[in-house]
A protein has these predicted regions:
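Conserved, structured core segments of small domains
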Residues: 1-104
Length: 104
């Protein structure tokens, strides 16, 4: 299953103190094939990141997010999670097939 996650972080010393541990954690998830893409969101008033996960289910995703150093240090001020079915593009071969619409 694919999930698109956004994380918003408060500005402050905590972000700078824990950003390298966060990046190392994300790199580990990339190596494991669980995090497929990630990066900062540009042009927003607060620091934010977008992450695309490919995991077995929502429970696995929740556990991965909970283990992120930004989460353990209380540095996620807003989190959104959307289950995503990438029918077109780079991840399409891994999408869940859906039946085509019936014609009238």
């Amino acid at each position: 299953m694919f999930f698109v996650v956004t994380m918003t972080h408060p500005d402050g010393a905590g972000w700078g103190q824990h950003v390298m541990a966060h990046v190392q954690y994300l790199n580990t998830l990339v190596e494991q094939g669980k995090l497929r893409a990630s990066g900062p969101a540009n042009g927003l008033p607060l620091r934010a990141g977008l992450l695309i996960f490919s995991v077995a289910d929502r429970a696995e995703l929740d556990a991965l997010i909970a283990a992120d150093p930004f989460a353990t240090e209380g540095l996620i001020s807003e989190l959104t999670v959307i289950e995503w079915n990438p029918l077109f593009g780079t991840f399409a071969a891994e999408a869940t097939p859906i039946a085509p619409p019936r014609s009238a």
